[in-house]
Protein backbone atom coordinates (compact mmCIF):
# COMPACT_ATOMS: atom_id res chain seq x y z
CA UNK A 1 0.00 0.00 0.00
CA UNK A 2 1.21 3.51 -0.80
CA UNK A 3 2.06 5.11 2.60
CA UNK A 4 0.59 8.39 1.38
CA UNK A 5 -2.84 6.69 1.22
CA UNK A 6 -2.75 5.55 4.86
CA UNK A 7 -4.11 8.78 6.45
CA UNK A 8 -7.04 8.78 4.05
CA UNK A 9 -7.81 5.13 4.89
CA UNK A 10 -7.72 5.80 8.64
CA UNK A 11 -9.99 8.82 8.19
CA UNK A 12 -12.45 6.77 6.15
CA UNK A 13 -12.56 3.98 8.74
CA UNK A 14 -13.12 6.45 11.56
CA UNK A 15 -15.96 7.97 9.60
CA UNK A 16 -17.75 4.63 9.61
CA UNK A 17 -18.11 4.67 13.38
CA UNK A 18 -18.40 8.37 14.15
CA UNK A 19 -21.68 8.96 16.04
CA UNK A 20 -24.20 10.78 13.91
CA UNK A 21 -22.24 10.19 10.70
CA UNK A 22 -25.13 8.31 9.11
CA UNK A 23 -22.84 5.35 8.47
CA UNK A 24 -22.61 3.92 11.98
CA UNK A 25 -22.01 0.24 12.58
CA UNK A 26 -25.44 -1.32 13.07
CA UNK A 27 -26.36 -3.59 15.97
CA UNK A 28 -26.99 -7.21 15.11
CA UNK A 29 -30.65 -8.12 14.53
CA UNK A 30 -32.69 -9.55 17.35
CA UNK A 31 -32.62 -13.34 17.50
CA UNK A 32 -35.06 -15.93 18.87
CA UNK A 33 -34.35 -19.36 20.31
CA UNK A 34 -36.79 -21.75 21.98
CA UNK A 35 -36.37 -24.40 24.64
CA UNK A 36 -39.41 -26.18 26.06
CA UNK A 37 -42.01 -23.43 26.58
CA UNK A 38 -39.51 -20.57 26.82
CA UNK A 39 -38.38 -18.14 24.14
CA UNK A 40 -35.08 -16.32 24.57
CA UNK A 41 -34.52 -13.00 22.83
CA UNK A 42 -30.92 -11.90 22.23
CA UNK A 43 -28.95 -9.56 19.98
CA UNK A 44 -29.89 -6.09 18.89
CA UNK A 45 -29.11 -3.52 21.56
CA UNK A 46 -30.29 -5.71 24.44
CA UNK A 47 -28.00 -5.58 27.49
CA UNK A 48 -28.63 -9.29 28.05
CA UNK A 49 -31.01 -12.10 27.11
CA UNK A 50 -34.75 -11.61 27.66
CA UNK A 51 -36.65 -14.79 28.54
CA UNK A 52 -40.34 -15.16 27.72
CA UNK A 53 -42.55 -17.92 29.11
CA UNK A 54 -44.56 -18.45 25.95
CA UNK A 55 -47.29 -19.37 26.67
CA UNK A 56 -47.48 -19.45 30.47
CA UNK A 57 -51.22 -20.17 30.57
CA UNK A 58 -54.48 -20.19 28.62
CA UNK A 59 -57.30 -18.99 30.85
CA UNK A 60 -61.04 -19.39 31.40
CA UNK A 61 -63.36 -16.49 32.32
CA UNK A 62 -64.13 -15.77 35.97
CA UNK A 63 -60.41 -15.78 36.73
CA UNK A 64 -60.32 -12.72 39.02
CA UNK A 65 -61.82 -14.53 42.02
CA UNK A 66 -61.31 -18.25 41.39
CA UNK A 67 -58.52 -20.75 42.01
CA UNK A 68 -55.84 -20.26 39.40
CA UNK A 69 -54.67 -23.84 38.88
CA UNK A 70 -57.89 -25.80 39.24
CA UNK A 71 -60.49 -23.40 37.81
CA UNK A 72 -58.76 -20.91 35.50
CA UNK A 73 -55.89 -22.59 33.65
CA UNK A 74 -56.72 -24.70 30.58
CA UNK A 75 -53.94 -27.30 30.19
CA UNK A 76 -52.13 -27.24 26.87
CA UNK A 77 -49.30 -28.91 25.00
CA UNK A 78 -46.83 -26.90 22.94
CA UNK A 79 -44.80 -27.97 19.90
CA UNK A 80 -42.15 -26.21 17.84
CA UNK A 81 -43.25 -26.52 14.20
CA UNK A 82 -40.44 -24.58 12.49
CA UNK A 83 -37.41 -22.46 13.35
CA UNK A 84 -35.11 -20.60 11.00
CA UNK A 85 -31.41 -21.33 11.61
CA UNK A 86 -30.59 -17.61 11.86
CA UNK A 87 -33.05 -17.14 14.74
CA UNK A 88 -35.28 -14.77 12.79
CA UNK A 89 -38.49 -16.79 13.09
CA UNK A 90 -40.16 -19.60 14.99
CA UNK A 91 -43.56 -21.21 14.53
CA UNK A 92 -45.24 -22.76 17.57
CA UNK A 93 -48.45 -24.77 17.79
CA UNK A 94 -50.33 -25.03 21.09
CA UNK A 95 -53.08 -27.61 21.53
CA UNK A 96 -55.46 -26.98 24.42
CA UNK A 97 -57.06 -29.81 26.36
CA UNK A 98 -60.47 -28.90 24.92
CA UNK A 99 -59.18 -29.29 21.35
CA UNK A 100 -58.51 -25.64 20.46
CA UNK A 101 -55.38 -25.13 18.35
CA UNK A 102 -53.37 -21.89 18.53
CA UNK A 103 -50.59 -21.29 16.01
CA UNK A 104 -47.98 -18.57 16.63
CA UNK A 105 -45.67 -17.18 13.95
CA UNK A 106 -43.04 -15.12 15.77
CA UNK A 107 -40.58 -13.04 13.75
CA UNK A 108 -37.53 -11.17 15.09
CA UNK A 109 -36.45 -8.03 13.25
CA UNK A 110 -33.92 -5.25 13.87
CA UNK A 111 -35.66 -3.69 16.88
CA UNK A 112 -38.92 -5.59 17.32
CA UNK A 113 -40.50 -9.00 17.58
CA UNK A 114 -43.74 -9.52 15.65
CA UNK A 115 -46.44 -12.00 16.75
CA UNK A 116 -49.09 -13.32 14.36
CA UNK A 117 -51.48 -15.67 16.15
CA UNK A 118 -54.40 -17.74 14.88
CA UNK A 119 -56.69 -19.50 17.38
CA UNK A 120 -59.18 -21.98 15.95
CA UNK A 121 -61.70 -24.37 17.40
CA UNK A 122 -62.00 -27.47 15.20
CA UNK A 123 -64.35 -29.20 17.65
CA UNK A 124 -68.12 -29.27 17.95
CA UNK A 125 -68.03 -27.76 21.45
CA UNK A 126 -67.67 -24.11 22.44
CA UNK A 127 -64.31 -23.33 24.06
CA UNK A 128 -64.00 -21.13 27.16
CA UNK A 129 -60.47 -20.03 26.19
CA UNK A 130 -60.74 -16.31 26.94
CA UNK A 131 -57.16 -15.09 27.23
CA UNK A 132 -53.52 -16.14 27.32
CA UNK A 133 -50.35 -15.11 29.12
CA UNK A 134 -46.96 -14.43 27.51
CA UNK A 135 -44.73 -13.74 30.54
CA UNK A 136 -41.76 -11.46 29.72
CA UNK A 137 -38.95 -11.70 32.30
CA UNK A 138 -37.16 -8.37 32.68
CA UNK A 139 -34.53 -8.79 35.39
CA UNK A 140 -31.51 -8.50 33.08
CA UNK A 141 -32.94 -5.68 30.98
CA UNK A 142 -33.90 -3.71 34.08
CA UNK A 143 -30.78 -4.59 36.08
CA UNK A 144 -33.11 -5.92 38.78
CA UNK A 145 -32.57 -8.37 41.60
CA UNK A 146 -35.06 -11.23 41.28
CA UNK A 147 -35.01 -11.63 45.06
CA UNK A 148 -37.00 -8.37 45.33
CA UNK A 149 -39.78 -9.50 42.99
CA UNK A 150 -42.23 -10.36 45.79
CA UNK A 151 -42.07 -6.89 47.35
CA UNK A 152 -45.27 -4.84 47.49
CA UNK A 153 -43.68 -2.48 44.95
CA UNK A 154 -40.50 -4.16 43.67
CA UNK A 155 -37.73 -1.78 42.53
CA UNK A 156 -38.05 -2.79 38.86
CA UNK A 157 -41.72 -1.73 38.87
CA UNK A 158 -40.58 1.88 39.19
CA UNK A 159 -39.01 1.53 35.72
CA UNK A 160 -42.33 0.28 34.26
CA UNK A 161 -45.05 2.32 32.58
CA UNK A 162 -48.44 2.12 30.91
CA UNK A 163 -50.82 4.69 29.44
CA UNK A 164 -53.70 6.23 31.40
CA UNK A 165 -55.90 8.76 29.57
CA UNK A 166 -53.33 8.74 26.76
CA UNK A 167 -50.46 9.76 29.03
CA UNK A 168 -47.41 7.69 29.90
CA UNK A 169 -47.78 6.84 33.59
CA UNK A 170 -44.98 5.33 35.64
CA UNK A 171 -45.54 2.69 38.30
CA UNK A 172 -46.39 2.61 41.13
CA UNK A 173 -49.69 4.16 40.10
CA UNK A 174 -51.84 5.93 42.66
CA UNK A 175 -53.85 4.37 44.20
CA UNK A 176 -51.89 1.09 44.45
CA UNK A 177 -54.21 -1.89 44.95
CA UNK A 178 -53.20 -4.41 47.63
CA UNK A 179 -56.20 -6.73 48.17
CA UNK A 180 -56.78 -9.86 46.06
CA UNK A 181 -56.93 -13.65 46.18
CA UNK A 182 -53.17 -13.73 45.49
CA UNK A 183 -50.64 -11.01 46.34
CA UNK A 184 -48.62 -8.95 45.41
CA UNK A 185 -48.61 -7.63 41.82
CA UNK A 186 -50.78 -5.08 40.00
CA UNK A 187 -53.40 -5.72 37.32
CA UNK A 188 -54.87 -3.12 34.95
CA UNK A 189 -58.10 -4.08 33.20
CA UNK A 190 -59.16 -2.20 30.03
CA UNK A 191 -62.69 -0.92 29.58
CA UNK A 192 -63.64 -3.58 27.03
CA UNK A 193 -62.87 -6.50 29.40
CA UNK A 194 -65.06 -7.73 32.27
CA UNK A 195 -63.22 -7.12 35.54
CA UNK A 196 -64.15 -10.65 36.66
CA UNK A 197 -61.95 -12.08 33.89
CA UNK A 198 -58.40 -10.98 34.71
CA UNK A 199 -55.45 -12.10 36.82
CA UNK A 200 -56.39 -12.83 40.47
CA UNK A 201 -53.82 -10.31 41.75
CA UNK A 202 -54.53 -6.81 43.13
CA UNK A 203 -56.70 -5.04 40.55
CA UNK A 204 -56.12 -1.32 40.05
CA UNK A 205 -59.16 0.95 39.72
CA UNK A 206 -57.25 2.76 36.95
CA UNK A 207 -58.25 1.86 33.40
CA UNK A 208 -55.53 1.79 30.73
CA UNK A 209 -56.24 3.76 27.57
CA UNK A 210 -54.24 1.32 25.41
CA UNK A 211 -52.36 -1.94 25.73
CA UNK A 212 -48.94 -0.36 25.32
CA UNK A 213 -46.77 -0.95 28.38
CA UNK A 214 -43.07 -1.32 28.97
CA UNK A 215 -39.96 -0.76 31.03
CA UNK A 216 -36.86 1.41 30.90
CA UNK A 217 -33.47 -0.29 30.87
CA UNK A 218 -31.13 -0.08 33.85
CA UNK A 219 -29.19 2.80 32.25
CA UNK A 220 -32.38 4.58 31.14
CA UNK A 221 -31.30 4.65 27.51
CA UNK A 222 -33.66 2.01 26.10
CA UNK A 223 -37.27 0.91 26.36
CA UNK A 224 -38.63 -2.60 26.02
CA UNK A 225 -42.36 -2.32 25.30
CA UNK A 226 -45.20 -4.80 24.74
CA UNK A 227 -48.54 -4.64 22.95
CA UNK A 228 -51.20 -7.05 21.68
CA UNK A 229 -54.48 -6.58 19.82
CA UNK A 230 -56.89 -7.50 21.23
CA UNK A 231 -55.58 -7.50 24.78
CA UNK A 232 -57.06 -8.69 28.07
CA UNK A 233 -54.96 -6.97 30.73
CA UNK A 234 -51.69 -5.36 31.71
CA UNK A 235 -50.00 -7.08 34.64
CA UNK A 236 -46.92 -6.20 36.68
CA UNK A 237 -46.05 -9.64 37.95
CA UNK A 238 -44.23 -11.37 40.76
CA UNK A 239 -41.16 -12.81 39.01
CA UNK A 240 -39.66 -9.55 37.71
CA UNK A 241 -42.01 -9.78 34.75
CA UNK A 242 -44.45 -7.66 32.77
CA UNK A 243 -47.48 -8.88 30.83
CA UNK A 244 -49.65 -7.55 28.06
CA UNK A 245 -51.86 -10.63 27.95
CA UNK A 246 -53.78 -11.22 24.75
CA UNK A 247 -57.51 -11.76 24.45
CA UNK A 248 -59.24 -14.64 22.68
CA UNK A 249 -62.76 -14.17 24.05
CA UNK A 250 -63.90 -17.78 23.68
CA UNK A 251 -64.33 -19.76 20.47
CA UNK A 252 -67.52 -21.21 19.04
CA UNK A 253 -67.39 -24.54 17.19
CA UNK A 254 -65.50 -24.05 13.92
CA UNK A 255 -64.56 -20.45 14.78
CA UNK A 256 -61.13 -18.88 14.18
CA UNK A 257 -59.73 -15.62 15.55
CA UNK A 258 -56.55 -13.69 14.82
CA UNK A 259 -54.39 -11.81 17.31
CA UNK A 260 -51.25 -9.81 16.68
CA UNK A 261 -48.58 -8.37 18.91
CA UNK A 262 -45.20 -6.64 19.18
CA UNK A 263 -42.23 -6.41 21.47
CA UNK A 264 -40.27 -3.22 20.80
CA UNK A 265 -36.63 -2.70 21.82
CA UNK A 266 -36.01 0.96 21.07
CA UNK A 267 -34.22 4.09 22.29
CA UNK A 268 -35.86 5.82 25.25
CA UNK A 269 -37.94 8.26 23.22
CA UNK A 270 -41.50 7.93 24.49
CA UNK A 271 -43.07 10.04 21.75
CA UNK A 272 -41.47 8.03 18.94
CA UNK A 273 -42.54 4.80 20.63
CA UNK A 274 -46.14 5.98 20.98
CA UNK A 275 -46.27 7.16 17.36
CA UNK A 276 -44.94 3.81 16.18
CA UNK A 277 -47.38 1.88 18.37
CA UNK A 278 -50.31 3.86 17.00
CA UNK A 279 -49.24 3.11 13.42
CA UNK A 280 -49.00 -0.60 14.25
CA UNK A 281 -52.19 -0.70 16.33
CA UNK A 282 -54.58 1.95 14.96
CA UNK A 283 -57.46 0.30 16.85
CA UNK A 284 -55.88 1.50 20.09
CA UNK A 285 -54.64 4.92 18.93
CA UNK A 286 -55.45 7.61 21.51
CA UNK A 287 -58.49 5.63 22.56
CA UNK A 288 -59.98 7.33 25.64
CA UNK A 289 -60.62 5.06 28.61
CA UNK A 290 -64.39 4.67 28.87
CA UNK A 291 -66.22 3.32 31.87
CA UNK A 292 -64.99 -0.15 32.85
CA UNK A 293 -67.32 -3.12 32.68
CA UNK A 294 -68.99 -3.82 36.00
CA UNK A 295 -67.65 -6.59 38.21
Put a short name on every predicted segment.
Residues 1-5:
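Positively charged n-region of N-terminal signal peptides that target proteins for export
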Residues 7-17:
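Bacterial N-terminal signal peptides
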Residues 23-24, 84-85, 93-95, 183-293:
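Beta-strand-rich recognition/accessory modules
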Residues 24-80, 89:
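Acidic-aromatic substrate-binding/catalytic surfaces of carbohydrate-active enzymes
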Residues 63-110, 128-130:
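Extended, loop-rich substrate-binding clefts of extracytoplasmic carbohydrate-active enzymes
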Residues 93, 105, 116-120, 135, ...:
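Residue-level recognition of well-ordered beta-strand positions that form the cores
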Residues 108-165:
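Acidic (Asp/Glu-rich), glycine- and aromatic
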Residues 150-198:
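Low-complexity, serine/threonine/proline-enriched polar segments
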